[in-house]
Protein backbone atom coordinates (compact mmCIF):
# COMPACT_ATOMS: atom_id res chain seq x y z
CA UNK A 1 0.00 0.00 0.00
CA UNK A 2 3.02 2.29 0.16
CA UNK A 3 3.37 4.66 -2.79
CA UNK A 4 7.00 4.56 -3.95
CA UNK A 5 8.30 7.23 -6.32
CA UNK A 6 12.04 7.12 -5.58
CA UNK A 7 12.99 6.20 -9.15
CA UNK A 8 11.05 9.16 -10.55
CA UNK A 9 12.98 11.70 -8.46
CA UNK A 10 16.39 10.01 -8.62
CA UNK A 11 17.64 12.79 -10.92
CA UNK A 12 16.75 16.44 -10.38
CA UNK A 13 15.64 17.39 -13.85
CA UNK A 14 13.04 19.65 -15.39
CA UNK A 15 9.61 18.29 -14.59
CA UNK A 16 10.79 15.43 -12.36
CA UNK A 17 8.73 16.67 -9.43
CA UNK A 18 5.99 18.10 -11.62
CA UNK A 19 5.16 14.63 -12.90
CA UNK A 20 4.34 13.60 -9.35
CA UNK A 21 1.40 16.03 -9.39
CA UNK A 22 -0.30 13.79 -11.94
CA UNK A 23 -0.39 10.75 -9.63
CA UNK A 24 -3.75 9.84 -8.17
CA UNK A 25 -3.01 6.97 -5.78
CA UNK A 26 -1.82 8.39 -2.50
CA UNK A 27 -2.23 11.99 -3.72
CA UNK A 28 -3.68 14.96 -1.91
CA UNK A 29 -6.45 15.19 -4.49
CA UNK A 30 -7.76 11.78 -3.48
CA UNK A 31 -7.83 12.81 0.18
CA UNK A 32 -9.20 16.33 -0.25
CA UNK A 33 -11.59 16.36 -3.17
CA UNK A 34 -14.65 15.66 -0.99
CA UNK A 35 -14.06 18.52 1.46
CA UNK A 36 -13.08 20.84 -1.38
CA UNK A 37 -16.33 20.22 -3.27
CA UNK A 38 -18.32 20.89 -0.10
CA UNK A 39 -16.43 24.16 0.43
CA UNK A 40 -17.10 25.27 -3.16
CA UNK A 41 -20.77 24.43 -2.87
CA UNK A 42 -21.20 26.36 0.39
CA UNK A 43 -19.33 29.38 -0.97
CA UNK A 44 -21.48 29.75 -4.06
CA UNK A 45 -24.70 29.14 -2.13
CA UNK A 46 -23.86 32.07 0.17
CA UNK A 47 -22.93 34.18 -2.86
CA UNK A 48 -26.25 33.39 -4.55
CA UNK A 49 -28.20 34.28 -1.39
CA UNK A 50 -26.33 37.59 -1.05
CA UNK A 51 -26.93 38.60 -4.65
CA UNK A 52 -30.44 37.30 -5.23
CA UNK A 53 -32.34 36.61 -2.01
CA UNK A 54 -31.49 39.48 0.36
CA UNK A 55 -33.10 42.90 0.48
CA UNK A 56 -31.13 46.12 0.53
CA UNK A 57 -31.22 46.38 4.33
CA UNK A 58 -30.23 42.73 4.65
CA UNK A 59 -27.41 43.22 2.16
CA UNK A 60 -26.02 46.07 4.28
CA UNK A 61 -26.05 43.84 7.36
CA UNK A 62 -24.38 41.02 5.41
CA UNK A 63 -21.72 43.39 4.07
CA UNK A 64 -20.88 44.57 7.59
CA UNK A 65 -20.62 40.94 8.67
CA UNK A 66 -18.33 40.21 5.73
CA UNK A 67 -16.01 43.09 6.57
CA UNK A 68 -15.94 42.04 10.22
CA UNK A 69 -15.06 38.42 9.42
CA UNK A 70 -12.41 39.46 6.91
CA UNK A 71 -10.70 41.79 9.40
CA UNK A 72 -10.54 39.28 12.26
CA UNK A 73 -9.98 36.06 10.34
CA UNK A 74 -6.20 36.46 10.44
CA UNK A 75 -6.21 36.30 14.24
CA UNK A 76 -6.61 32.50 14.09
CA UNK A 77 -3.02 31.09 14.37
CA UNK A 78 -3.64 28.33 11.87
CA UNK A 79 -0.08 28.13 10.54
CA UNK A 80 1.37 27.99 14.04
CA UNK A 81 -1.01 25.27 15.23
CA UNK A 82 -0.74 23.15 12.09
CA UNK A 83 3.05 23.38 11.94
CA UNK A 84 3.62 21.97 15.41
CA UNK A 85 0.92 19.33 15.03
CA UNK A 86 2.16 17.96 11.72
CA UNK A 87 5.76 17.92 12.99
CA UNK A 88 4.68 15.87 15.99
CA UNK A 89 2.70 13.44 13.84
CA UNK A 90 5.48 12.94 11.27
CA UNK A 91 8.04 12.28 14.03
CA UNK A 92 5.70 9.77 15.62
CA UNK A 93 5.10 8.12 12.24
CA UNK A 94 8.81 7.67 11.54
CA UNK A 95 9.46 6.28 15.03
CA UNK A 96 6.79 3.64 14.46
CA UNK A 97 8.48 2.64 11.22
CA UNK A 98 11.84 2.28 12.96
CA UNK A 99 10.26 -0.09 15.49
CA UNK A 100 8.92 -2.54 12.91
CA UNK A 101 10.27 -5.99 13.88
CA UNK A 102 12.62 -7.35 11.23
CA UNK A 103 14.01 -10.83 12.11
CA UNK A 104 17.09 -10.67 9.87
CA UNK A 105 19.71 -10.21 12.60
CA UNK A 106 18.07 -12.80 14.82
CA UNK A 107 17.94 -15.43 12.08
CA UNK A 108 21.65 -14.90 11.35
CA UNK A 109 22.52 -15.55 14.98
CA UNK A 110 20.28 -18.61 15.19
CA UNK A 111 21.77 -20.08 12.02
CA UNK A 112 25.30 -19.44 13.31
CA UNK A 113 25.03 -20.32 17.01
CA UNK A 114 22.61 -23.28 17.06
CA UNK A 115 24.63 -26.17 15.67
CA UNK A 116 23.60 -29.53 14.27
CA UNK A 117 22.58 -30.65 10.80
CA UNK A 118 20.57 -33.54 12.16
CA UNK A 119 16.81 -33.61 12.59
CA UNK A 120 16.95 -32.29 16.15
CA UNK A 121 19.14 -29.32 15.21
CA UNK A 122 16.94 -28.45 12.25
CA UNK A 123 13.81 -28.69 14.40
CA UNK A 124 15.39 -26.49 17.05
CA UNK A 125 16.35 -23.70 14.64
CA UNK A 126 13.02 -23.68 12.80
CA UNK A 127 11.07 -23.65 16.06
CA UNK A 128 13.06 -20.70 17.38
CA UNK A 129 12.37 -18.62 14.28
CA UNK A 130 8.72 -19.68 14.20
CA UNK A 131 8.34 -18.36 17.76
CA UNK A 132 9.90 -15.07 16.68
CA UNK A 133 7.53 -14.75 13.71
CA UNK A 134 4.57 -15.68 15.90
CA UNK A 135 5.42 -12.86 18.30
CA UNK A 136 5.61 -10.40 15.38
CA UNK A 137 2.27 -11.55 13.97
CA UNK A 138 0.54 -11.30 17.34
CA UNK A 139 1.61 -7.68 17.82
CA UNK A 140 0.83 -6.68 14.22
CA UNK A 141 -2.55 -8.38 14.51
CA UNK A 142 -3.24 -6.21 17.55
CA UNK A 143 -2.42 -2.86 15.92
CA UNK A 144 -2.98 -3.31 12.16
CA UNK A 145 -6.43 -3.64 10.66
CA UNK A 146 -5.03 -5.33 7.55
CA UNK A 147 -3.29 -8.08 9.54
CA UNK A 148 -6.31 -8.57 11.79
CA UNK A 149 -8.54 -9.09 8.77
CA UNK A 150 -6.11 -11.74 7.60
CA UNK A 151 -5.86 -13.52 10.98
CA UNK A 152 -9.04 -12.68 12.90
CA UNK A 153 -8.62 -15.52 15.44
CA UNK A 154 -5.88 -17.79 16.87
CA UNK A 155 -7.29 -20.67 14.84
CA UNK A 156 -6.34 -18.80 11.68
CA UNK A 157 -2.78 -18.62 12.96
CA UNK A 158 -2.80 -22.38 13.47
CA UNK A 159 -4.09 -22.94 9.95
CA UNK A 160 -1.50 -20.50 8.55
CA UNK A 161 1.34 -22.46 10.18
CA UNK A 162 2.52 -19.88 12.71
CA UNK A 163 1.34 -22.02 15.60
CA UNK A 164 0.82 -25.73 16.23
CA UNK A 165 -2.38 -27.04 17.86
CA UNK A 166 -0.47 -27.95 21.02
CA UNK A 167 0.95 -24.42 21.24
CA UNK A 168 -2.54 -23.02 20.77
CA UNK A 169 -3.82 -25.12 23.67
CA UNK A 170 -0.89 -23.94 25.75
CA UNK A 171 -1.81 -20.32 25.03
CA UNK A 172 -5.43 -20.90 25.96
CA UNK A 173 -4.36 -22.57 29.18
CA UNK A 174 -2.27 -19.51 30.08
CA UNK A 175 -4.97 -17.04 29.13
CA UNK A 176 -4.73 -13.69 30.94
CA UNK A 177 -6.75 -10.46 30.70
CA UNK A 178 -3.84 -8.93 28.75
CA UNK A 179 -2.38 -9.08 25.29
CA UNK A 180 -0.39 -12.30 24.87
CA UNK A 181 2.08 -11.12 22.21
CA UNK A 182 4.93 -11.55 24.71
CA UNK A 183 4.43 -15.29 25.30
CA UNK A 184 6.27 -16.56 22.18
CA UNK A 185 9.31 -14.53 23.25
CA UNK A 186 9.33 -16.35 26.60
CA UNK A 187 9.23 -19.64 24.73
CA UNK A 188 12.14 -18.46 22.60
CA UNK A 189 14.27 -17.63 25.64
CA UNK A 190 13.53 -20.93 27.40
CA UNK A 191 14.18 -22.99 24.28
CA UNK A 192 17.50 -21.17 23.71
CA UNK A 193 18.59 -21.98 27.25
CA UNK A 194 17.60 -25.61 26.72
CA UNK A 195 19.70 -25.70 23.53
CA UNK A 196 22.70 -24.37 25.46
CA UNK A 197 22.26 -26.97 28.18
CA UNK A 198 21.99 -29.69 25.53
CA UNK A 199 25.21 -28.56 23.87
CA UNK A 200 23.64 -27.10 20.73
CA UNK A 201 25.01 -23.66 21.68
CA UNK A 202 28.66 -23.98 22.66
CA UNK A 203 29.33 -20.97 24.83
CA UNK A 204 27.21 -18.90 27.25
CA UNK A 205 28.52 -15.78 25.53
CA UNK A 206 26.79 -16.91 22.33
CA UNK A 207 23.63 -17.55 24.29
CA UNK A 208 23.82 -14.04 25.75
CA UNK A 209 24.20 -12.51 22.27
CA UNK A 210 21.21 -14.49 21.03
CA UNK A 211 19.04 -13.40 23.96
CA UNK A 212 20.12 -9.77 23.55
CA UNK A 213 18.94 -9.74 19.95
CA UNK A 214 15.72 -11.44 20.97
CA UNK A 215 15.14 -8.77 23.61
CA UNK A 216 15.70 -6.10 20.97
CA UNK A 217 12.86 -7.47 18.85
CA UNK A 218 10.71 -7.87 21.94
CA UNK A 219 11.33 -4.22 22.82
CA UNK A 220 10.33 -3.10 19.33
CA UNK A 221 7.07 -5.03 19.62
CA UNK A 222 6.46 -3.36 22.97
CA UNK A 223 7.05 0.07 21.43
CA UNK A 224 4.50 -0.63 18.70
CA UNK A 225 2.01 -1.71 21.34
CA UNK A 226 2.65 1.50 23.31
CA UNK A 227 2.28 3.71 20.21
CA UNK A 228 -1.07 2.09 19.48
CA UNK A 229 -2.19 2.51 23.08
CA UNK A 230 -0.92 6.06 23.77
CA UNK A 231 -2.10 8.34 20.98
CA UNK A 232 -1.52 12.03 20.41
CA UNK A 233 -3.56 13.82 23.10
CA UNK A 234 -7.13 14.20 21.97
CA UNK A 235 -7.31 17.85 23.01
CA UNK A 236 -4.42 18.69 20.69
CA UNK A 237 -6.13 16.99 17.77
CA UNK A 238 -9.39 18.76 18.57
CA UNK A 239 -7.74 22.18 18.78
CA UNK A 240 -6.08 21.73 15.40
CA UNK A 241 -9.25 20.46 13.74
CA UNK A 242 -11.41 23.24 15.19
CA UNK A 243 -8.84 25.89 14.19
CA UNK A 244 -8.76 24.73 10.57
CA UNK A 245 -12.49 24.29 10.06
CA UNK A 246 -13.45 27.48 11.91
CA UNK A 247 -10.98 29.40 9.75
CA UNK A 248 -12.65 28.24 6.55
CA UNK A 249 -16.16 28.70 7.93
CA UNK A 250 -15.22 32.34 8.47
CA UNK A 251 -13.77 32.42 4.95
CA UNK A 252 -17.15 31.43 3.50
CA UNK A 253 -18.51 34.82 4.63
CA UNK A 254 -15.41 37.00 4.96
CA UNK A 255 -14.01 36.21 1.50
CA UNK A 256 -17.20 37.05 -0.40
CA UNK A 257 -16.85 39.78 -3.06
CA UNK A 258 -19.19 42.68 -2.24
CA UNK A 259 -20.97 45.01 -4.62
CA UNK A 260 -18.31 47.24 -6.27
CA UNK A 261 -20.85 50.08 -6.59
CA UNK A 262 -20.77 50.62 -2.83
CA UNK A 263 -16.98 51.23 -2.93
CA UNK A 264 -15.96 49.13 0.02
CA UNK A 265 -12.15 49.14 0.51
CA UNK A 266 -10.65 46.04 -1.08
CA UNK A 267 -13.82 45.21 -3.02
CA UNK A 268 -13.31 47.25 -6.16
CA UNK A 269 -13.67 44.13 -8.34
CA UNK A 270 -16.29 41.42 -8.32
CA UNK A 271 -14.50 38.15 -9.10
CA UNK A 272 -16.63 35.09 -9.48
CA UNK A 273 -13.84 32.65 -8.50
CA UNK A 274 -11.88 33.48 -5.30
CA UNK A 275 -8.69 31.83 -6.51
CA UNK A 276 -6.44 32.54 -3.54
CA UNK A 277 -9.12 31.51 -1.06
CA UNK A 278 -9.38 28.15 -2.82
CA UNK A 279 -5.60 27.78 -2.81
CA UNK A 280 -5.52 28.60 0.88
CA UNK A 281 -8.10 25.91 1.54
CA UNK A 282 -6.08 23.46 -0.53
CA UNK A 283 -2.89 24.16 1.44
CA UNK A 284 -4.25 24.29 4.98
CA UNK A 285 -6.83 21.54 4.65
CA UNK A 286 -4.29 19.40 2.80
CA UNK A 287 -1.83 20.00 5.62
CA UNK A 288 -4.40 18.67 8.06
CA UNK A 289 -5.07 15.66 5.83
CA UNK A 290 -1.37 14.78 5.93
CA UNK A 291 -1.55 14.56 9.71
CA UNK A 292 -4.79 12.55 9.55
CA UNK A 293 -3.19 9.96 7.27
CA UNK A 294 0.12 9.63 9.16
CA UNK A 295 -1.25 9.59 12.69
CA UNK A 296 -1.88 5.81 12.38
CA UNK A 297 0.20 4.17 9.64
CA UNK A 298 -1.17 0.68 10.37
CA UNK A 299 -4.48 1.24 8.62
CA UNK A 300 -5.50 0.63 5.02
CA UNK A 301 -4.68 3.98 3.44
CA UNK A 302 -2.56 4.25 0.33
CA UNK A 303 0.54 5.32 2.26
CA UNK A 304 0.21 3.02 5.28
CA UNK A 305 2.76 0.35 6.08
CA UNK A 306 2.67 -2.94 4.17
CA UNK A 307 2.18 -5.07 7.26
CA UNK A 308 0.93 -8.19 5.47
CA UNK A 309 3.93 -8.13 3.17
CA UNK A 310 6.20 -7.81 6.22
CA UNK A 311 4.59 -10.93 7.73
CA UNK A 312 5.11 -12.97 4.56
CA UNK A 313 8.65 -11.81 3.96
CA UNK A 314 9.78 -12.37 7.56
CA UNK A 315 8.53 -15.96 7.67
CA UNK A 316 9.98 -16.91 4.30
CA UNK A 317 13.49 -15.52 4.73
CA UNK A 318 13.87 -16.60 8.37
CA UNK A 319 12.99 -20.26 7.73
CA UNK A 320 15.22 -20.31 4.67
CA UNK A 321 18.18 -18.85 6.58
CA UNK A 322 18.05 -21.31 9.49
CA UNK A 323 17.20 -24.45 7.51
CA UNK A 324 18.46 -24.75 3.95
CA UNK A 325 21.22 -22.16 4.30
CA UNK A 326 22.57 -23.55 7.59
CA UNK A 327 26.22 -24.51 6.98
CA UNK A 328 25.50 -24.48 3.25
CA UNK A 329 28.42 -22.50 1.87
CA UNK A 330 29.72 -22.17 -1.67
CA UNK A 331 33.27 -23.45 -2.20
CA UNK A 332 36.05 -20.95 -1.61
CA UNK A 333 37.90 -19.96 -4.75
CA UNK A 334 40.44 -17.35 -5.71
CA UNK A 335 38.87 -14.19 -6.97
CA UNK A 336 39.80 -12.68 -10.32
CA UNK A 337 41.91 -9.99 -8.62
CA UNK A 338 44.04 -12.47 -6.67
CA UNK A 339 47.35 -11.23 -8.08
CA UNK A 340 46.24 -7.67 -8.77
CA UNK A 341 47.17 -5.22 -5.98
CA UNK A 342 44.91 -2.53 -7.48
CA UNK A 343 41.68 -4.09 -8.74
CA UNK A 344 39.72 -2.05 -11.28
CA UNK A 345 36.17 -3.29 -11.79
CA UNK A 346 34.96 -2.59 -15.34
CA UNK A 347 32.39 0.03 -16.32
CA UNK A 348 29.62 -0.39 -18.85
CA UNK A 349 29.04 2.09 -21.63
CA UNK A 350 26.10 3.58 -19.74
CA UNK A 351 28.11 4.09 -16.53
CA UNK A 352 31.45 5.17 -18.03
CA UNK A 353 30.70 8.84 -17.39
CA UNK A 354 30.41 8.25 -13.64
CA UNK A 355 34.03 7.12 -13.35
CA UNK A 356 36.00 9.61 -11.27
CA UNK A 357 39.58 9.84 -9.99
CA UNK A 358 40.26 9.53 -6.29
CA UNK A 359 39.98 12.60 -4.08
CA UNK A 360 43.17 13.46 -2.18
CA UNK A 361 42.05 16.62 -0.41
CA UNK A 362 41.37 20.25 -1.22
CA UNK A 363 45.05 21.26 -0.73
CA UNK A 364 46.48 18.56 -2.99
CA UNK A 365 46.82 20.84 -6.04
CA UNK A 366 48.34 23.82 -4.22
CA UNK A 367 51.82 24.64 -5.53
CA UNK A 368 54.51 26.60 -3.68
CA UNK A 369 57.70 28.21 -4.88
CA UNK A 370 61.09 26.86 -3.97
CA UNK A 371 61.82 29.78 -1.65
CA UNK A 372 58.48 29.37 0.15
CA UNK A 373 59.21 25.72 0.92
CA UNK A 374 62.51 26.42 2.70
CA UNK A 375 62.57 26.32 6.51
CA UNK A 376 63.49 29.57 8.25
CA UNK A 377 66.18 29.88 10.92
CA UNK A 378 64.93 30.52 14.42
CA UNK A 379 66.39 34.02 14.59
CA UNK A 380 64.35 35.05 11.54
CA UNK A 381 61.01 33.78 12.83
CA UNK A 382 60.35 36.98 14.77
CA UNK A 383 61.08 39.13 11.74
CA UNK A 384 58.70 37.11 9.53
CA UNK A 385 55.85 37.00 12.01
CA UNK A 386 54.01 39.75 10.17
CA UNK A 387 51.57 42.46 11.22
CA UNK A 388 48.84 39.96 12.08
CA UNK A 389 51.22 37.93 14.21
CA UNK A 390 52.30 41.01 16.17
CA UNK A 391 48.66 42.01 16.58
CA UNK A 392 47.80 38.57 17.99
CA UNK A 393 50.82 38.59 20.29
CA UNK A 394 52.87 35.92 18.50
CA UNK A 395 56.36 36.41 19.88
CA UNK A 396 59.36 34.21 20.23
CA UNK A 397 60.01 32.53 23.56
CA UNK A 398 63.38 34.29 23.76
CA UNK A 399 61.76 37.73 23.78
CA UNK A 400 58.88 37.13 26.16
CA UNK A 401 59.87 36.19 29.73
CA UNK A 402 57.40 34.27 31.85
CA UNK A 403 55.18 36.16 34.25
CA UNK A 404 56.09 35.88 37.89
CA UNK A 405 55.17 37.45 41.20
CA UNK A 406 56.79 37.76 44.60
CA UNK A 407 55.59 34.31 45.66
CA UNK A 408 56.20 32.18 42.58
CA UNK A 409 59.65 33.77 42.39
CA UNK A 410 60.77 31.39 45.15
CA UNK A 411 60.81 28.53 42.63
CA UNK A 412 62.95 30.37 40.09
CA UNK A 413 66.75 30.46 39.96
CA UNK A 414 68.35 33.59 41.35
CA UNK A 415 69.78 35.99 38.84
CA UNK A 416 72.67 38.30 39.25
CA UNK A 417 72.02 41.71 40.65
CA UNK A 418 71.01 44.40 38.17
CA UNK A 419 72.23 47.94 38.37
CA UNK A 420 70.11 51.01 38.05
CA UNK A 421 71.59 54.47 37.82
CA UNK A 422 74.98 53.15 38.89
CA UNK A 423 73.77 51.63 42.21
CA UNK A 424 73.20 47.94 42.87
CA UNK A 425 69.62 46.91 43.59
CA UNK A 426 70.36 43.93 45.81
CA UNK A 427 73.66 43.32 47.62
CA UNK A 428 72.42 40.61 49.95
CA UNK A 429 73.25 37.68 47.68
CA UNK A 430 76.91 38.73 47.53
CA UNK A 431 77.24 38.43 51.32
CA UNK A 432 76.25 34.78 51.48
CA UNK A 433 78.97 32.29 52.19
CA UNK A 434 79.64 29.33 49.96
CA UNK A 435 77.74 26.82 52.16
CA UNK A 436 74.58 28.91 52.16
CA UNK A 437 74.77 29.26 48.40
CA UNK A 438 74.98 25.48 48.01
CA UNK A 439 72.00 25.06 50.33
CA UNK A 440 69.99 27.62 48.42
CA UNK A 441 70.84 25.91 45.12
CA UNK A 442 69.71 22.52 46.46
CA UNK A 443 66.52 24.08 47.79
CA UNK A 444 65.76 25.72 44.45
CA UNK A 445 66.24 22.41 42.63
CA UNK A 446 63.86 20.69 45.02
CA UNK A 447 61.29 23.43 44.56
CA UNK A 448 61.70 23.16 40.79
CA UNK A 449 60.94 19.43 40.86
CA UNK A 450 57.94 19.84 43.12
CA UNK A 451 56.47 22.62 41.01
CA UNK A 452 54.00 21.98 38.22
CA UNK A 453 55.15 22.04 34.60
CA UNK A 454 53.51 25.38 33.99
CA UNK A 455 55.39 26.90 36.94
CA UNK A 456 58.92 25.94 35.87
CA UNK A 457 61.38 28.32 34.22
CA UNK A 458 61.18 28.43 30.47
CA UNK A 459 57.53 27.37 30.30
CA UNK A 460 55.45 30.07 28.65
CA UNK A 461 51.73 29.91 29.30
CA UNK A 462 48.78 32.02 30.39
CA UNK A 463 48.99 33.83 33.76
CA UNK A 464 48.42 31.38 36.59
CA UNK A 465 46.35 31.87 39.72
CA UNK A 466 48.39 33.51 42.52
CA UNK A 467 49.57 31.20 45.26
CA UNK A 468 47.71 31.28 48.57
CA UNK A 469 49.22 31.97 52.00
CA UNK A 470 49.66 28.30 52.81
CA UNK A 471 52.93 26.65 53.88
CA UNK A 472 55.06 25.17 51.13
CA UNK A 473 54.99 21.36 51.16
CA UNK A 474 58.02 19.48 49.93
CA UNK A 475 57.65 16.01 48.39
CA UNK A 476 58.44 13.11 50.75
CA UNK A 477 61.45 12.00 48.71
CA UNK A 478 63.00 15.47 48.67
CA UNK A 479 64.62 16.96 51.73
CA UNK A 480 64.81 20.61 52.55
CA UNK A 481 68.29 22.18 52.47
CA UNK A 482 70.25 22.97 55.54
CA UNK A 483 69.39 26.62 55.46
CA UNK A 484 65.67 25.96 55.52
CA UNK A 485 66.01 23.47 58.36
CA UNK A 486 67.47 26.32 60.35
CA UNK A 487 64.42 28.41 59.46
CA UNK A 488 61.97 25.75 60.67
CA UNK A 489 64.09 25.18 63.76
CA UNK A 490 63.99 28.70 65.19
CA UNK A 491 64.04 28.52 68.93
CA UNK A 492 61.29 29.82 71.14
CA UNK A 493 63.28 32.89 72.10
CA UNK A 494 63.48 34.02 68.51
CA UNK A 495 59.74 33.43 68.10
CA UNK A 496 59.00 35.48 71.19
CA UNK A 497 61.11 38.29 69.80
CA UNK A 498 59.28 38.11 66.47
CA UNK A 499 55.97 38.57 68.26
CA UNK A 500 57.08 41.84 69.78
CA UNK A 501 56.08 45.09 68.05
CA UNK A 502 58.50 46.08 65.36
CA UNK A 503 59.53 49.47 64.18
CA UNK A 504 57.18 51.29 61.82
CA UNK A 505 59.59 50.98 58.91
CA UNK A 506 59.81 47.21 59.27
CA UNK A 507 56.01 46.98 59.62
CA UNK A 508 55.55 48.82 56.36
CA UNK A 509 58.06 46.60 54.58
CA UNK A 510 56.10 43.40 55.28
CA UNK A 511 52.56 44.73 55.32
CA UNK A 512 51.70 42.80 52.12
CA UNK A 513 51.38 39.44 53.92
CA UNK A 514 48.41 39.15 56.31
CA UNK A 515 48.73 37.76 59.79
CA UNK A 516 46.38 34.90 58.92
CA UNK A 517 49.28 33.06 57.29
CA UNK A 518 50.05 31.36 60.60
CA UNK A 519 46.45 30.26 61.06
CA UNK A 520 46.34 28.65 57.64
CA UNK A 521 49.35 26.50 58.50
CA UNK A 522 47.97 25.14 61.81
CA UNK A 523 45.76 22.34 60.34
CA UNK A 524 48.74 20.95 58.45
CA UNK A 525 50.83 20.72 61.60
CA UNK A 526 48.29 18.35 63.23
CA UNK A 527 48.03 16.06 60.21
CA UNK A 528 49.02 12.42 60.53
CA UNK A 529 50.91 12.52 57.24
CA UNK A 530 54.58 13.35 57.72
CA UNK A 531 55.45 16.42 55.72
CA UNK A 532 58.31 18.84 55.70
CA UNK A 533 57.02 22.38 55.72
CA UNK A 534 58.60 25.78 55.57
CA UNK A 535 56.65 28.55 57.25
CA UNK A 536 57.25 32.10 56.07
CA UNK A 537 55.98 34.26 58.91
CA UNK A 538 56.56 37.71 57.50
CA UNK A 539 53.83 39.48 59.45
CA UNK A 540 55.94 40.78 62.30
CA UNK A 541 59.70 40.44 62.19
CA UNK A 542 62.24 41.79 64.59
CA UNK A 543 64.76 44.21 63.33
CA UNK A 544 67.77 42.61 61.66
CA UNK A 545 71.25 43.09 63.19
CA UNK A 546 73.29 46.00 62.14
CA UNK A 547 75.92 43.98 60.25
CA UNK A 548 73.21 42.42 58.06
CA UNK A 549 71.39 45.60 57.11
CA UNK A 550 71.72 46.94 53.60
CA UNK A 551 73.00 50.42 53.00
CA UNK A 552 70.25 52.85 52.11
CA UNK A 553 71.31 53.68 48.54
CA UNK A 554 68.04 55.27 47.42
CA UNK A 555 66.05 58.10 48.93
CA UNK A 556 62.93 56.92 50.83
CA UNK A 557 59.83 57.12 48.66
CA UNK A 558 57.19 55.72 51.00
CA UNK A 559 55.64 52.30 51.13
CA UNK A 560 55.36 51.97 47.34
CA UNK A 561 59.10 52.25 46.90
CA UNK A 562 59.64 49.37 49.34
CA UNK A 563 57.02 47.19 47.63
CA UNK A 564 58.58 47.66 44.22
CA UNK A 565 61.87 46.18 45.50
CA UNK A 566 61.08 42.47 45.21
CA UNK A 567 63.38 41.16 47.92
CA UNK A 568 63.45 37.44 48.33
CA UNK A 569 61.95 36.51 51.73
CA UNK A 570 64.07 33.37 51.71
CA UNK A 571 67.30 35.34 52.06
CA UNK A 572 65.79 37.55 54.76
CA UNK A 573 64.73 34.58 56.85
CA UNK A 574 68.05 32.79 56.43
CA UNK A 575 70.05 35.86 57.49
CA UNK A 576 67.68 36.29 60.40
CA UNK A 577 68.27 32.70 61.41
CA UNK A 578 72.03 33.20 61.38
CA UNK A 579 71.70 36.37 63.39
CA UNK A 580 69.79 34.56 66.14
CA UNK A 581 72.12 31.61 66.04
UniProtKB/Swiss-Prot annotation:
Phosphorylated (in vitro). Dephosphorylated (in vitro) by PP2A. It comes from the Eukaryota. GO terms for cellular component: basolateral plasma membrane; chloride channel complex; membrane microdomain; plasma membrane; presynapse. Ca(2+) binds at residues 10, 293, 296, 301, 304. Keywords: Calcium, Cell membrane, Chloride, Chloride channel, Ion channel, Ion transport, Membrane, Metal-binding, Phosphoprotein, Transmembrane, Transmembrane helix, Transport. It catalyses: chloride(in) = chloride(out); hydrogencarbonate(in) = hydrogencarbonate(out); 4-aminobutanoate(in) = 4-aminobutanoate(out); L-glutamate(out) = L-glutamate(in). Residues 416-440 are annotated as: Disordered. It is found in: Cell membrane; Basolateral cell membrane. The chain crosses the membrane at residues 32-51, 61-82, 238-255, 275-288. It is a multi-pass membrane protein. GO terms for biological process: gamma-aminobutyric acid secretion, neurotransmission; glutamate secretion; protein complex oligomerization; regulation of synaptic plasticity. This is Bestrophin-1. Residues 52-60, 256-274 are extracellular. Residues 1-31, 83-237, 289-581 are cytoplasmic. Belongs to the anion channel-forming bestrophin (TC 1.A.46) family. Calcium-sensitive chloride channel subfamily. Its main location: membrane. InterPro entries: Bestrophin (IPR000615), Bestrophin-like (IPR021134).
Amino acid sequence: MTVTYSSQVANARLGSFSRLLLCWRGSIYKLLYGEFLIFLLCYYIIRFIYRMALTDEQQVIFEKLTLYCDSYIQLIPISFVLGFYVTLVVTRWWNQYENLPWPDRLMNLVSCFVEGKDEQGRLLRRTLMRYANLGNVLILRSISAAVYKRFPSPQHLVKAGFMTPSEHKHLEKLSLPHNSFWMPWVWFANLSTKAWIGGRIRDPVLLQSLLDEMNTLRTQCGHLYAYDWISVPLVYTQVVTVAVYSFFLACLVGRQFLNPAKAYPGHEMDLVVPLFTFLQFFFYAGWLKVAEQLINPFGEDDDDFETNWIVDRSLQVSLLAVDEMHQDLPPMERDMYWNDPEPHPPYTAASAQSRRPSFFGSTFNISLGKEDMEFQPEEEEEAHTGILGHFLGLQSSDHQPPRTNSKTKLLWPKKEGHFHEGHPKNLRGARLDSSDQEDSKAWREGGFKSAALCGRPGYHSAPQTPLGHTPMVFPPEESAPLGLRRVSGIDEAAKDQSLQPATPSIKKSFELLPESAEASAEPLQGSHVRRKTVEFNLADLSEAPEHLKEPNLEPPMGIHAIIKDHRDPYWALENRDEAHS
